[in-house]
Design a protein with these regions (language model features):
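Bacterial N-terminal signal peptides that target proteins for export
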Residues: 1-8
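Repetitive helical segments and hydrophobic/amphipathic motifs
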Residues: 11-12
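C-terminal motif of bacterial Sec signal peptides marking the signal peptidase cleavage site
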Residues: 17-20
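Non-catalytic all-alpha helical scaffold/repeat segments
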Residues: 27-28, 36-154
Length: 154
């Protein structure tokens, strides 16, 4: 008789544990609300020592799992602060530039895929900034995420 409650209790605990694991994996909560701080920045002595694009890309690498767990606001700031973001303008079109930079910085595609990215970017635009380059980035990113909605702006 004592075995039945013990087996039943064990089974129920396993079900609860398995359900918890599935929920965490499938419905990842975006809980990190601070953007990534890049350890090496343009204009520093460390940056000047990086002698190739590959070296700069490696120095700016952000763990995709970290970005995936960020709120959209934190991810947007991480993208805006990306030291190689200006490279999106180094091509004949912004679309080609974003495609190129997305090849070595996953943050752009992650931002593009967020359901609330357009709203988050628009909020940042509406808030305004004294930095004209930041505003240009925001407007470019706004056009980029609109492609997720099927309305390319490039």
């Amino acid at each position: 008789m004592k075995k039945i409650p013990t087996v039943l209790l064990t089974f129920m605990m396993l079900v609860v544990l398995c359900t918890g694991c599935t929920s965490e994996k499938d419905g990842k909560a975006k809980q990190i609300d601070t953007p990534y701080v890049y350890p090496i920045q343009p204009g520093t002595e460390e940056w000047a020592k990086l002698d190739s694009l590959d070296a700069k890309i490696a120095a700016c690498k952000v763990d995709p799992e970290l970005m995936d767990s960020m709120t959209t606001e934190a991810l947007l700031e991480t993208v805006l602060d990306y030291p190689l973001l200006p490279n999106i303008y180094a091509f004949s079109s912004t679309e080609i530039g974003i495609g190129s930079v997305s090849g070595y910085f996953e943050g752009l595609q992650m931002l593009h895929d967020r359901e609330d990215a357009a709203e988050c970017i628009q909020k940042a635009i509406d808030t305004g900034t004294d930095d004209p380059l930041r505003m240009q980035y925001l407007q470019t990113l706004a056009s980029y995420v609109r492609t997720r909605l099927g309305a390319p702006d490039f």
